[in-house]
C-alpha cells in the first residue's frame, strides 16, 4: 500500500484544481452574478485571481475576484511617507477608500517601522490589502540599500505574508537580461518604478542578479504558504509617452509571462502590472499584447496616463486611459490622484482620484457587457425622468457630493435645479404628457 500523502490544499488555485468551490469563490460568484463553477474554472487556470491571504480571511475580509468576465476592480494607494509622516491622515484615506467603494488598499508606507500601521489596516479593513515589500526593506532591516542581502529581502516578504497581506507587488521581472536591453536601447525617463529603481540600483552596485528573479521558487513557497497573490511588478513601465511600448517594457513583459507559468505550476495566484504613460491609440494593442504574453493573467494597470502635461489633473488623464485599458482587457485599475507627480495626496485628492477611477472602471464594465453593469445607469435614467432627486442619490457613485452641490444652490421651482429652473426640459415634456399647463415664468 502506498504511504504517499495527498498534497495539502492551501491556495484558491489548489482548491479550484481539486474541483472544490471555496467560500471565497461562492462570494465572488454572488457579487459578480456568475455561476460558482465559472469562477472555479478560471481560478484554476489563472484567468481569475482572488487575493485573499488565509490570515486576512480569518479576520473577516470580503472576497474580491480580479480577472476575466468580472467587474473592473479599483485600488487606492496610501501609506506613511518619510517627508510627511502622519498616520492619522492616512487613516482618513482608509475611511474614504472604504466609504466610497474601493475594492483594495495598497499600503505603500516607506518610512520607519511600518508594521504597526500595516497590521492594524489588515485587522480593520475588509478590503483587499496589497503592499510592496521592497519599499519597506530598508526601514525594516535598518540597513542601506546596497547592504541588503537576499535573505533580508525575503524576510520582509515573509513578514508581510504573516501579517495577512493579500497581494504583494514584487518586481521579479527586471533581471540582468532586461537591464541589458534597458542600458543598450536607452529611455527618456529611464526607470520610474520605485521598487524597480531600487532593485536596479542594488543590481548595478552589487553586480548580482535580482534575488526575486534568481530565487523565484523560494518566493513562491512563501506566497503559497499564506495564499498571497503575487502581483508581478512592471519595473520598466513607461514613465512618459516617449517610452511606451519600447524594447525595455516589452522585454520585461516577456519575462513576466514566463514567471506567470512558474507560479501557476505550484499553485500560486498571479496578477501582472502594467503601464504607466501611453498614447490613447496605443492602449488597446498593449492590453492585448500583455494578455497574450502573460497567458490571460489578470492585468493591473496604473491608468495609463494619456498625456504627460496634465499636471494637477492627472486623475483625469489616468481615468481616460483607464476606461480604454479596462474596456480592452485590463482587470484592475490603480487610482491616480490630482497630486500625482507633485506631492503626497491629501484626503480630498484621494476622494477625487478614487471617484475618477471608479467612473473609468464602470464605463469599461458597461462596454465589456459585465453582467448587470448598466443596471444603476438605467435606474438613474428612470429617476431623472421623474425628477426624483432622492432616487438619483441612491443611484449615484458619489451621492454625498451630488446632494451637497444640489442643496447648495436651491431652485425656486420644486423638482428642478438652478441650471434650468422652470425651463427644465424633463419638466416640460412631463407636463406635456400629463396634459398640464407649461408655466415657464414668462407669463407674468
Language-model features: where?
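Hydrophobic alpha-helical segments with strong N-terminal bias
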Residues: 3-6, 313, 349, 405
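Alpha/beta enzyme core
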Residues: 3, 11-15, 20-309, 313, ...
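Catalytic or ion-coupling anion/metal-binding cores of large enzyme and transporter domains
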Residues: 180-207, 238, 242-244, 344-444
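Basic/polar N-terminal segments that are highly enriched at the extreme N-terminus
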Residues: 1-10, 442-444
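C-terminal catalytic subdomain
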Residues: 309-318, 324-370
Amino acid at each position: 500500500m502506498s504511504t504517499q500523502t495527498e498534497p495539502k490544499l492551501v491556495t484558491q488555485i489548489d482548491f479550484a484544481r481539486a474541483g472544490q468551490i471555496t467560500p471565497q469563490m461562492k462570494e465572488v460568484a454572488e457579487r459578480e452574478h456568475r455561476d460558482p463553477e465559472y469562477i472555479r474554472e478560471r481560478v484554476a487556470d489563472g484567468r481569475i485571481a482572488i487575493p485573499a491571504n488565509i490570515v486576512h480571511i480569518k479576520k473577516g475580509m470580503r472576497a474580491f475576484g480580479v480577472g476575466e468576465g468580472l467587474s473592473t476592480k479599483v485600488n487606492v494607494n496610501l501609506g506613511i511617507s518619510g517627508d510627511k509622516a502622519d498616520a492619522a491622515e492616512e487613516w482618513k484615506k482608509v475611511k474614504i477608500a472604504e466609504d466610497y467603494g474601493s475594492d483594495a488598499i495598497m499600503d505603500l508606507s516607506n518610512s520607519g517601522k511600518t508594521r504597526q500601521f500595516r497590521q492594524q489596516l489588515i485587522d480593520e479593513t475588509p478590503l483587499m490589502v496589497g503592499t510592496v515589500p521592497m519599499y519597506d526593506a530598508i526601514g525594516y532591516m535598518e540597513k542601506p540599500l546596497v547592504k541588503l542581502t537576499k535573505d533580508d529581502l525575503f524576510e520582509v516578504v515573509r513578514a508581510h505574508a504573516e501579517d495577512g497581506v493579500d497581494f504583494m507587488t514584487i518586481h521579479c521581472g527586471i533581471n540582468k537580461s532586461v537591464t541589458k536591453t534597458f542600458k543598450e536601447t536607452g529611455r527618456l525617463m529611464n526607470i520610474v518604478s520605485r521598487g524597480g529603481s531600487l532593485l536596479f540600483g542594488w543590481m548595478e552596485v552589487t553586480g548580482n542578479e535580482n534575488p526575486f528573479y534568481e530565487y523565484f521558487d523560494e518566493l513562491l513557497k512563501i506566497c503559497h504558504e499564506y495564499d498571497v497573490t503575487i502581483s508581478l511588478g512592471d519595473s520598466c513601465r513607461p514613465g512618459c509617452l516617449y517610452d511606451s511600448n519600447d524594447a525595455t517594457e516589452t522585454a520585461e513583459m516577456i519575462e513576466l509571462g514566463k514567471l506567470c507559468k512558474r507560479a501557476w505550476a505550484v499553485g500560486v495566484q498571479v496578477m501582472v502590472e502594467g503601464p504607466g504613460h501611453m498614447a490613447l491609440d496605443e492602449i488597446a494593442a498593449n492590453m492585448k499584447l500583455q494578455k497574450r504574453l502573460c497567458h490571460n493573467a489578470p492585468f493591473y494597470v496604473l491608468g495609463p496616463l494619456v498625456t504627460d502635461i496634465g499636471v494637477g489633473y492627472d486623475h483625469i488623464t489616468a481615468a481616460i486611459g483607464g476606461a480604454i485599458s479596462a474596456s480592452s482587457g485590463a482587470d484592475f485599475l490603480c487610482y491616480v490622484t490630482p497630486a500625482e507627480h507633485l506631492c503626497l495626496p491629501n484626503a480630498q485628492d484621494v476622494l477625487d482620484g478614487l471617484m475618477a477611477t471608479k467612473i473609468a472602471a464602470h464605463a469599461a464594465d458597461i462596454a465589456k457587457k459585465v453582467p448587470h453593469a448598466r443596471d444603476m445607469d438605467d435606474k438613474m435614467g428612470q429617476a431623472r425622468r421623474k425628477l426624483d432627486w432622492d432616487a438619483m442619490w441612491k443611484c449615484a457613485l458619489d451621492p454625498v457630493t451630488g446632494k451637497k452641490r444640489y442643496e447648495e444652490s436651491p431652485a425656486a421651482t420644486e423638482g428642478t435645479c438652478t441650471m434650468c429652473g422652470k425651463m427644465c426640459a424633463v419638466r416640460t415634456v412631463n407636463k406635456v404628457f400629463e396634459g398640464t399647463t407649461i408655466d415657464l415664468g414668462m407669463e407674468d
